[in-house]
Amino acid sequence: MKIFLPVIVVLAALFALLCFLVAPRRGHKDWAFLRQYRFAHRGLHRQPVSAADYPADPAVPDVPPRWAEDVAAAAEPVLPENSLAAFRRAAEAGFGAELDVHLTRDGRLAVVHDSELARVTGRAGSVEKLTWREFGDYRLLGTGEKIPCLEEVLPLFEASGTPLVVEIKTCGANFAEVTSAAVACLDGFHARCCIESFDPRVLLWLRRNRPEIVRGQLSMDFMREPNGLRLSQRILATNLLIDFKTRPDFIAYEFGARRRLAVRLCCGLLGGQEFNWTLRSMTDLAQAERGGRLGIFERFVPDGTETAFEKPLAVAAK
């Protein structure tokens, strides 16, 4: 027994340290409201699955775009991701929505997922290098839909009363600039929102400057998908080891990796809230919800019928 006691003490100390590192903030008053909703990923879009395919070089558009043939053959109107049409559809259907914001060269908040616009517009261009006026020439997936700014989206959810998950996309060291701009924009509306980011500096800024805002750490299994991160960054991000600095209200974790120890500690034993992304079937959404997690979904409408959108936007039988 004397031999095992030091080992037990060391293991207990390591476990206590891990719990300290990954612990969330608990008890935010807005969670009861957020838990009433499901969240449409980049709006309740309707687009071919080929729209998610990146060019070989993300900054250089394919000619023609990979989605061009499927969009032309679509039997229903295409509603691109992160478009006003997709957000309007989500709000009118009573869903919350998740969206992405980047800061343009002249300080506007563009609602678009990628920094490089080639995938969704078929044209070259980097969000952070363009002015808002230059954005006027870009269209999403060959439709008439423009890339919206955040202040165009917020009134839709202010009117519907359904919430938004605002993902802040940073570029280089602009985390404070883009976060403060997003918060200032949100302050001008009465839409119910929370903020998330892969960049823990965003959460640290919120903790120091706007602690009343619900904040969430986005993450995934970066050990499996490095995404250009150094090994040390991959270990820290995958295992939520920066939480002790940011104390997020929730973790938004990739659904397929939700069983990782750090996630289960933070969102199980330690009482943190959890979103799962991106859920592409009613089966996955139901499984997430049975586990007490909020779902961010796409490619189907969770109304009991499960409508799937495949090439060329054929609607699955009910």
Name what the model sees in each region.
Residues K2-K318:
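Phosphate-group recognition and catalysis centered on beta-loop-alpha active-site segments
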